[in-house]
Amino acid sequence: MSNNQKRLSIGLMIALVGFPQISETIYTPALPNVASGLLASVHSVEATLAIYFLGFAIGVLLWGTISDWCGRRTAMLMGLIVYGIGTVGCANVESVESLLAWRFLQAFGASVGSVITQTIIRDSYEGAERTKIFVVMSGALAFSPAIGPLLGGFISEFFGWRANFWVLALLSIVLGIWSFVSLSETRPNHHKRISAVKIYLLFRDMMRSRALWGHILLISATNGILFGFYQEAPFVFIEQLGMQPSHYGLFGLLIATATMLAARLSHQLNNRYSSQHLIQCGAMCVFLGGSIFTLIVGMGIFNVKMVGVSIAVLTLFVIFFGIGLIIPNSLSHALKPYQMVAGTAGSIFGGCYYFLITVFTWAMSVMHNGTALPLPFYMTMLGLVLACGSQMIRFPQGMAEKC
C-alpha cells in the first residue's frame, strides 16, 4: 500500500476510467440515424468508431509520458479540456468527414481517463490490493459501455443523435470540476523524468517481451469484441430485426451483468487460482460462445426472432463473462516489471493495444455486408487471438499464488 492510497478517491477513479467508454458507445444505437442524417454510407459511419480508437491510441502514447513530466493531475485536467472541445465539435457537425475529425480530437482527450487513471492506481496500490482495485475498475469498464447504449438509445429516440454529444459535453464539465477539486498528485516523489533515449530503450525492451505482447493481445482483443459488438449490433438488431433503439440499449445491461459477475467471481477466485488460469478460462468462454453464435446464425436459426435472439443472448452472456475474467487479471500483471516508469510504460502498453483495437474495429466495418454473420464470426476469430495471448503470458513462480 502506498501513502498515496489515502488521498485516492475511488469514486473519481471509476468516473474517469468510465467516461471514455461512455463516449464511445452512447451514440451507437443512433448509428443508422447518423448515416441517414449526414447522408453517409454505413461503412463511413462505422469508421467513426475506428477513428475514435486511433485518436485514443495516439493519446494514450502521449498522456502517460506527459504525466511523468508534469504530473498526473495536470495531465488529467489538460485531457478533459481537449475532450470537451472535441465533444462540442461532434455535436455541431454537418458532414461525416467533420464528425471523423472531431471524434479523433474527442478520443485524444478522452484517452487521458484510461492511461492516467491506471497510472494513478499503480502509483497508489501494490500487490494483491492493486489486483482487487483493478477488479473494481474492470467492473466500471464493463458497466460504463453499458450505460452508453442504454442512455443513448433513449436520448436518440426522443431528442435526436446530436443530443448525445451535448450530454457528453456536460459530463466533461462535471469531471473537470470534480478533478480540479478532488484529484491529488500521486506521482512518486522520487520519480525521475525519463529522457528520449531512455524512452526508446524502454520501448525496445517492452517490444521484446513475449509476455507483454500476450497482454497486449488480451486487452486489445477483449475490447475489440466489446466495441465491435457496439459497432455492428445496431445494424443487426435494429435494422434487420426491427428493435427500437431504446430496447437495443438493454444489451448494455446484459454485457455489464456478465462482465461484472465474472469480475466478482475473479475477485473471489484470485486467492485459489492463478491469474493465468482465470485468463485461459475466459479465453475458452469467448471462443465457445462465439462459435455457437456463429453456428446459429449460419444455420438460419437467428432469423427466427424469439428463438434466435434468445440463443444469441445466452451466447453473448458467455462471451462477455469470459471477457470479465480476462481484463482485471491481465491489467494487474501487465506492467509489473515497469513500475518505476509506470506512466511512460502505460502509454506504450496502452498505445499498442489501442492501435490493435483500431485495426479490429476497422476490420469489423469492412466485414459489414448487411447480414448478421460477420459479427459472430468476428467474435470467434478474436476468441482465437485471446487463446494465443493466454499462452504467451508468463507469471514468475510464486507470484500467481498470491494474486
Feature locations, PLM:
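Juxtamembrane intracellular "pre-TM" segments in multi-pass secondary transporters
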Residues: 1-2, 184-215
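Extracytoplasmic
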Residues: 8-42, 63, 229-234
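Helix-breaking motifs and short loop linkers at transmembrane-helix boundaries and internal kinks
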Residues: 37-39, 71, 92-98, 109, ...
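Conserved MFS/SLC helix-loop-helix module at the cytosolic interface between two early adjacent transmembrane helices
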Residues: 58-97
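Structural signature of the two symmetry-related core transmembrane helices
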Residues: 74-89, 277-293
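Paired small-residue
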Residues: 82-89, 97-105, 310-315
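Helix-loop-helix hairpin linking two adjacent transmembrane segments in secondary transporters
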Residues: 98, 135-181, 250
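Cytoplasmic helix-loop-helix junction between adjacent transmembrane helices
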Residues: 102-143
